[in-house]
């Protein structure tokens, strides 16, 4: 039903990450160290708008707050807004125990690199993608400098994007990251590389709906959240 690809960086310690998302029953947020999250949802595209991303980020933000995260939520972000939000989050992440970034919206891959599509991006040529879309490697680069034990990057961005069909070198879905992630990093996609998902018929995308329930399940280990 839901296909997920998870990349664990070398030397990643599951023992340190088992409580990275869900708390055991009776555990307060102060018991689990500093947890911060940045959630971004882009839906209001001029071409091929999406139904679910705004609901997705609001649902995930709500779930994360319930398990002790301090959440920054950004909706319908321009390229500049996405860049500013990730940079500010990267600075905060240096002092955190767990840093989580979640994105819902259009994305595509170009020559093996993954790009998240901002709102208002005027992408007319293949070359525009590099300059007018947000390279997801920048998220990993921001998290690389932190001392946090666990980094989690979740991309629900594999929706069927018409731009992927418009350019010769652009491919559907997202690619396995080429950027070497920081130690202690989990990267999760809503589908396998090179495949696409669709907006769900309900309030949330199918992937986010399952993720929401997994986050709120008490005592669930992090490796089980992404199964």
Language model: regions and residue ranges:
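Cleavable N-terminal signal peptides
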Residues: 3-4, 14
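Caspase-like (clan CD) cysteine peptidase catalytic core
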Residues: 34, 79-104, 108-165, 205-207, ...
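Short secondary-structure boundary/capping segments
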Residues: 29, 143-144, 177-179
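N-terminal leader/targeting signatures
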Residues: 6-8
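Active-site-proximal C-terminal subdomain of hydrolase catalytic domains
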Residues: 41, 53, 74, 148-227
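Generic short N-terminal amphipathic or hydrophobic helices
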Residues: 1-3, 20
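Boundary/activation segment at the start of structured domains
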Residues: 10-115, 120-123, 128, 190, ...
